[in-house]
């Protein structure tokens, strides 16, 4: 091994440094004798590593690792405008004028709730001339339950949320949707971001554990998962841990921490030792389905389930005994179909079989089945009558089985043990509480206080080459002082390592967590972050366009209680946010062609889900039901035929049950909804902070030919006809108000009426769905 603590002579590291093994290290020259002796003594004394190493880049030399400074805004009014204006003045750029009120109301609705305003909502704002009309509009939208659907979707991208496992089997995750609803609810309640992270990383280790905090731990469990049991493929555990670390790194810290799995990070000061200390903080996890019921309800469920199991087991034993003589009579005829050597092997008593005979006999005996209908045909009438009576009684008893208790698919750590008759598969907590899925086994907690299983440094990331045992820890370059590594709860039933990890992440001394989140919020309002690489604040990422503003926002975010809604208010009340997007200034274009300095508002194409939701809202078909189990919109049979495994509970008809908001669509990793995938739905296997935005021909083809779009165009036409029967001009005006939140101008009205003179109203409605103005926020 490279390093054997306590024995330098068996450590390849020492032997190569001393020239005892080839190739001698380091390359280019031998170490001094005193250095070689120091290495020998260090290894012989246990190779204790205190982590005191100078990183390649320190917090003093790289902007992202420095603690934020609450800079004084360089001007009056909204501090955002002061910081942005300073950069514009330095470049001699004149900003765009304010956008129209009609543009602003549509922008606000799409930004905050992901739905266009109705004509009445638009008119209400346009007619409200009070000085605080804009602020009151923002408050109404932040109070809407649809706010959580819109902004929760952004976090679900980061959390790589899906309703299936992925890979070749892509099995269903029947309780994953509860995590989605938790996220939506947390955004609606404006749960402070630091608490939001605590609940997701260590919701089972907090002082006050709630059903919501247990559901929240599904964040770490959202990884894609192969369909093999961990006990058969232990290396999979390291893949899941790597996914957790990658998600925490990219999604929370804005760092590619996973790049340090096999070696020190090539660009950022993240050591391989840091990676495995983080892994040790997570290593004790087990997947559990936390029952979301009170202890008394769980006890009652267990009691009734045990009674049903006992009675059904008793009846099945009687039934098997009744069938066994007939099964024994039918088996010889089935064995006779095999070659003579196989029949001979079966005929030899089990204790006397040779290894070869044991292999042959075992394969055949396990593979041969006598089916119930075969037994029925040879049974005596009185036995057949008794069999049917027993089967009916079993069915009757099964009907008394209590419904499965609701559970949260999350994680915990603790001394969980499989029951002797369990398959040793994925755990579910609490003896006697079953998971809703068919897989899994009963578990029970072991006695006493929890002992974390050992985790190891993996040499070159190889799970088969373990180095020194690791203790929990954090990324050194952004760690100040000596934060606790474990915060075990009083019960002692978990390690408290994840709680300590969460507290380190949300500590005011951590320079990245708040900085990354305010940058994400900024990105979703402006289409580009102050740091454009949302998931990478490291050396290979982009530098901030407004570093002083980013620092100020980070400190404000923490000072305002980590409130995301406070950040929305701050951003949306700025003149920077309210600027027009259509502003062709030659000087500004030449000095800042990418609009990095925000001299105008950045026009943005809507996300895939918002395009679908807007179509439903405009057609009048949108089902606004909040939360619950996922929906399964209709997918073409040809696409379903390509699905390898898993389920797609196709709706019987493309109707209201499937016309809910897109955040509730079943997210199958192996089969994204084609309509959404075309418009850049992100890969659900990895954390995604910023979606790709493409412009490809298939998007136009989908909007022209997709069955869903055509159906909604017809419903849109029906809505126009019902509102203004036979009056084409009123229908055109209403169509513009519904789809674009403005009336048509004279030229648009004339073109629309000319179109309707030759085409159907549904064709005109279809055209409205294809307009760039409908598909973009301006």
Predicted stretch roles:
Residues 666-669, 677-687:
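A structural supersecondary motif
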Residues 48, 52-72, 174-176, 212-217, ...:
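Primarily the internal scaffold of c-type cytochrome electron-transfer domains
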Residues 227-232, 671-678:
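Active-site Gly/Thr loop motif
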Residues 76-146, 161-210, 269, 313-322, ...:
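Primarily short, surface-exposed interaction patches in extracytoplasmic proteins
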Residues 1-40, 48-86, 90, 102-107, ...:
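Solvent-exposed helix-loop boundary motif
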């Amino acid at each position: 091994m490279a390093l054997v603590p306590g024995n330098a002579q068996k450590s390849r590291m020492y032997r190569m440094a001393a020239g005892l093994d080839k190739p001698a290290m380091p390359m280019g020259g031998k170490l001094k004798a005193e250095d070689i002796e120091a290495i020998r003594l260090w290894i012989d004394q246990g190779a204790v590593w205190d982590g005191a190493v100078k990183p390649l880049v320190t917090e003093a030399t790289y902007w992202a690792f420095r603690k934020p400074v609450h800079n004084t805004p360089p001007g009056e009014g909204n501090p955002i405008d002061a910081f942005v204006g300073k950069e514009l003045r330095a470049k001699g750029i004149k900003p765009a004028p304010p956008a129209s009120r009609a543009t602003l109301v549509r922008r606000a609705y799409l930004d905050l709730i992901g739905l266009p305003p109705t004509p009445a909502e638009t008119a209400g704002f346009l007619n409200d001339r009070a000085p605080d009309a804009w602020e009151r509009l923002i408050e109404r939208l932040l109070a809407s339950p649809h706010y959580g659907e819109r902004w929760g979707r952004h976090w679900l991208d980061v959390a790589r949320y899906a309703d299936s496992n992925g890979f070749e089997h892509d099995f269903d995750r029947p309780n994953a949707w509860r995590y989605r609803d938790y996220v939506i609810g947390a955004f609606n309640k404006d749960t402070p971001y630091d608490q939001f992270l605590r609940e997701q990383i260590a919701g089972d280790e907090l002082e006050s554990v709630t059903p919501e905090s247990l559901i929240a731990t599904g964040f770490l469990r959202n990884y894609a998962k192969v369909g093999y049991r961990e006990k058969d493929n232990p290396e999979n555990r390291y893949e899941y841990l790597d996914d957790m670390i990658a998600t925490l790194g990219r999604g929370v810290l804005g760092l590619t921490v996973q790049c340090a799995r096999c070696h020190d990070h090539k660009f950022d000061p993240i050591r391989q030792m840091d990676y495995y200390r983080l892994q040790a903080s997570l290593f004790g996890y087990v997947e559990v389905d936390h029952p979301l019921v009170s202890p008394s309800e769980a006890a009652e469920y267990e009691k009734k389930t045990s009674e049903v199991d006992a009675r059904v087991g008793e009846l099945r034993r009687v039934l098997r005994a009744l069938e066994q003589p007939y099964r024994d009579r039918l088996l010889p005829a089935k064995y006779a179909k095999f070659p003579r050597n196989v029949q001979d092997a079966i005929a030899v008593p089990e204790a006397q079989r040779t290894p070869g005979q044991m292999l042959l006999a075992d394969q055949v005996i396990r593979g041969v089945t006598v089916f119930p209908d075969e037994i029925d045909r040879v049974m005596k009438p009185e036995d057949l009558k008794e069999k049917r009576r027993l089967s009916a009684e079993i069915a009757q008893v099964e009907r008394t089985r209590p419904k499965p208790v609701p559970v949260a698919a999350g994680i915990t750590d603790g001394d969980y043990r499989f029951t002797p008759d369990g398959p040793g598969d994925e755990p579910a907590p609490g003896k006697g509480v079953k998971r809703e899925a068919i897989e899994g086994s009963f578990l029970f907690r072991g006695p006493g206080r929890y002992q974390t299983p050992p985790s190891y440094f993996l040499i070159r990331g190889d799970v088969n080459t373990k180095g020194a045992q690791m203790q929990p820890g954090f990324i050194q370059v952004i760690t100040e002082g000596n934060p606790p590594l474990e915060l075990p709860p009083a019960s002692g039933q978990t390690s408290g390592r994840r709680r300590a990890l969460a507290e380190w992440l949300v500590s005011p001394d951590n320079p990245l967590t708040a900085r990354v989140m305010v940058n994400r919020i900024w990105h979703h309002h402006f289409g580009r972050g102050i740091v454009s690489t949302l998931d990478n604040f490291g050396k290979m990422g982009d530098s901030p366009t407004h570093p002083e503003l980013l620092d100020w926002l980070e400190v404000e975010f923490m000072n305002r209680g980590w409130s995301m809604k406070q950040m929305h208010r701050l951003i949306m009340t700025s003149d920077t946010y309210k600027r027009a997007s259509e502003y062709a200034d030659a000087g500004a274009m030449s000095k800042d062609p990418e609009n990095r300095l925000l001299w105008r508002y950045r026009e943005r194409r809507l996300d895939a889900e918002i395009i679908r939701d807007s179509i439903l809202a405009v057609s009048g078909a949108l089902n606004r039901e909040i939360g619950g189990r996922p929906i399964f919109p209709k997918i073409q049979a040809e696409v379903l035929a390509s699905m390898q495994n898993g389920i797609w509970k196709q709706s019987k008809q493309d109707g209201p049950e499937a016309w809910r908001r897109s955040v509730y669509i079943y997210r199958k990793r192996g089969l994204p909804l084609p309509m959404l995938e075309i418009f850049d739905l992100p890969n659900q296997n990895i954390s995604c902070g910023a979606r790709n935005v493409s412009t490809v021909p298939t998007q136009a083809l989908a909007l022209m030919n997709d069955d869903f779009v055509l159906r909604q165009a017809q419903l849109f036409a029906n809505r126009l006809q019902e509102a203004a029967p036979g009056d084409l001009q009123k229908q055109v005006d209403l169509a513009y108000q519904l789809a674009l939140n403005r009336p048509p101008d004279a030229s648009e009205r004339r073109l629309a009426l000319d179109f309707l003179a030759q085409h159907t109203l549904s064709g005109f409605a279809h055209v409205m769905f294809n307009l760039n103005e409908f598909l973009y926020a301006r």
